[in-house]
Regions:
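Active-site-proximal alpha-helix that buttresses catalytic centers in soluble enzyme cores
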Residues: 3, 7-79
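Short beta->alpha junction loops/turns
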Residues: 56, 82, 108-109
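A short, structured active-site edge motif that brings together acidic residues
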Residues: 73-88, 94
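Active-site-adjacent alpha-helix immediately C-terminal to a catalytic or transition-state-stabilizing loop
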Residues: 60, 93-115
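A structure-centric signal for secondary-structure junctions around beta-strands
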Residues: 1-2, 100
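A generic local structural motif
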Residues: 38-40, 90-93
Length: 115
């Protein structure tokens, strides 16, 4: 059975309103939340074969906090996932190799929520 884990990036910071959206980091609360989610995944989630992650800083920082939970999964950081709609995310998932049983997708709302 194929499995998909949909993850929105953890809480981002709005401390510097001059930063481009793509470069917004996680807030301290977001770092803590991502670490808690990693603990949860280690205990409860199936082994992940592939992680697809948006190239935005906050999604990459979320991934960094969760990397251990994904074990030896292949990791792909992709520009096309930043700002992707649900249809675009679905199209990207259709291109995943058949050998991947469990895929984690770290992205943004509204795309993740709508998917």
């Amino acid at each position: 059975m194929k499995r998909l884990l949909l993850l929105r990036h953890a809480k981002s910071s709005w401390d510097d309103p001059g930063l481009p959206d793509h470069e917004r980091p996680l807030a301290p609360r977001g770092h803590r939340a991502a670490e808690r989610m990693a603990e949860y995944l280690r205990s409860n989630a199936p082994a992940v074969d592939l992680v697809l992650c948006s190239s935005a800083l906050r999604t990459r920082e979320t991934l960094e906090r969760m990397t251990d939970a994904f074990g030896g999964a292949e990791i792909a950081v992709e520009d096309e996932l930043y700002g992707a709609t649900d249809d675009e995310l679905l199209e990207r998932l259709r291109r995943v190799a058949m050998g991947s049983e469990t895929v984690a997708l770290i992205g943004h709302n509204p795309g993740i929520q709508d998917l």
